[in-house]
Amino acid sequence: VAQATLSCRYAAIHLVYLGIYTREEKMCLQGAVFLRNSIESVVSIERLPENVSFSTASGGMRSSRPTVNTVVLGGFMKICEQLHMIKGITAVIGSGGKTTLLRILAEELSGTVLLTTSTHILPFAGIPLLVTDDIEQVRRALALHRVICMGTPAAEGKLTAPALPFSVLADAADYVIVEADGSKRLPLKAHASHEPVIPENTRKTVCVVGASGFGKPIKQAVHRPELFYARTGAHMSGIVTPELAAQGIIAEHLADIVVLNQAETVSPEIAKRFTEALKSSGFTVVCTTLNHTLE
């Protein structure tokens, strides 16, 4: 239970699903929920949707039902494990939690981690910021701090791309995680022809989607709604459905894996509709709430 609770620190509050599992597994889940409820906030326990696999505390997959390429984070595996992070350059695109995902991955991953951007980003509180074109300074900073942020100072306190090429940075750090997109703080996005700005030699691209946009008018929830209309055939006065959001992602096909963030804002059935719409096109989907509480 203690291990489960520690692993819960960034995980979904809402998506702690109880399916058909052993008595021991249920007791572990219920104990973790009780402890988290006592320390932080109320945890909503829902039933595991059909055909969705569940990650146990041991890291194994346990389900008596068929599994699909959809993973629901219940707090027992790190997000970096669910995303199957690999060393090298990872680009994070989309909307509804990109920056929070970068911070969580930096804290979870073992090895040196360099956070940066190919567009613009705000510096991370508590993470050393390095502005340099000297790769040896980068190596020394990583050896000292393990996790650093790099970029070029720009207007409004933001950072733009670093002076050094991403491929050079990848030789210095185990993981280079790049925020490669902007979204105007909206939960959903359609990409223009010049977006996203994915670095050369990127090994994995993760697309973040904000579930809080489901059920809202497209023009209010989607960055570049005119492109969303064009790619999905949605009516200009329509609302965002899980199927339309998935259709937009499929049409663009920019990512290897999709993170449905803000999952506590929708029902399990809505989340399932989104994942089911994507899985037939070969996407892996992780449903979670990026609830970063440790600073």
Task: Indicate where each model-derived feature is located.
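Short hydrophobic targeting helices and cationic amphipathic motifs
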Residues: 15-18, 29, 35-38, 55
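Walker A (P-loop) phosphate-binding motif
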Residues: 79-109
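General beta-strand structural signal in soluble alpha/beta enzymes
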Residues: 92-93, 113-118, 149-152, 176-180, ...
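N-terminal phosphate/diphosphate-binding loop that engages ATP/GTP or pyrophosphate donors
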Residues: 106-153
